[in-house]
Amino acid sequence: GDILAARDTITCGGRYMNDNVKDTARSIMNDLGAADNAQNRDCAAYAADRLTGRVCASDRDDLKLAIENMTGGANTVLYDNAGRPSIMCAIPTMTMDDLYGNGDPSVHPAWVVDGDVKKVIYISKYMNVIEDGRAYSLPMRSAATYNTFEDCVNACLRKGKGWHLFTNAEWMAVAQWSKRNGTRPHGNTGDGCYHRATYERGLPATMFCRRAHLVKTGSGPVTWNHNHNASGIADLVGLMFEWVGGLRLMDGVFQIIPHNDAALYDENLLKIDSRRWRAVTTDGYLAAHGELNTLKVDGTVPGDALEEDHLLGRPVVSTELNNRSYLGAHTDGNQGYLDCQFCDLKAADGMEIPELAKILG
């Protein structure tokens, strides 16, 4: 009885322990495990597994079934190569007609990975935390911040095959679904609340100048989810800046990784010299870097060589780069920048934006 009580106490308190205390607890459990009594050994193994983040098969099944039952299968639990859980949203295959109502029966690129059409894609329900170098989708946490693109890519890849940074194709599919279904998500866009409805608040995770800065993942109302339902993807709007894979600007040129191939398990996939990057031409075809008539971001006014943060003007989508923002020598410092809301981004006179570019943002 005393051993069982100790097991439960250590198990329940494991998440609150620092590493030194956890090491001590593991040592105690190891000592117990050396005892002849089989019950002692079982208790020691159980507690040690829970302390190190592993979950036995029955616990895994219970957690997975509970989450799926509560959400009607819209959410599930997936485990990584360390045996640790993430709560995920299961998004079944959607066609272009499903998302745009255009009569096109072809599958949206987000469900096409290396030529294979997926029946479902899994997207983190919560902004991720990073623990032991791996990213996890968990509720009521302070999400990871101040990480480079490479940090975030690697935190996903370390979890094993199938795990990847949220791709641009996936992001655009979710955003379009919300738009079409009238559930554009709200979020933490102003000191812990939604700026257009300040009564919508999340639970503070960090404070700045006595005001909530970040909020705990998933702590906002259901309107902060992509479907305005408890089963939805939380915090897509506000909270923090997010990285996505498969879209970049290279020397002013829009480049994508076709379909949802940015989800492939490949440590070199998203690197600067990856051969999978493609530009988009004005007629909607994919092209190698340097080819003519590809989409670019140009300025509306001439740039300068000032190494300081300052607004130059608005960007415009063009096939030419006539007004580069920065004209000085290479620097990692601040430079002039172009700015406008995405919905206000225009194409140069006489130019049409191809559908592929619209679909992938």
What are these regions (language model features)?
Residues 179-185, 248, 255-259:
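Short secondary-structure boundary/capping segments
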Residues 67, 75-162, 251-313, 324:
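Extracellular adhesion/carbohydrate-recognition regions
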Residues 7, 18-31, 40-51:
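Amphipathic alpha-helical segments in structured regions that serve as interaction surfaces
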Residues 32-33, 49-77:
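Charged, compositionally biased non-catalytic regions
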Residues 107-236, 265-267:
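Short aromatic-cysteine micro-motif
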Residues 32-33, 49, 172, 197-214, ...:
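C-terminal, surface-exposed recognition/capping segments
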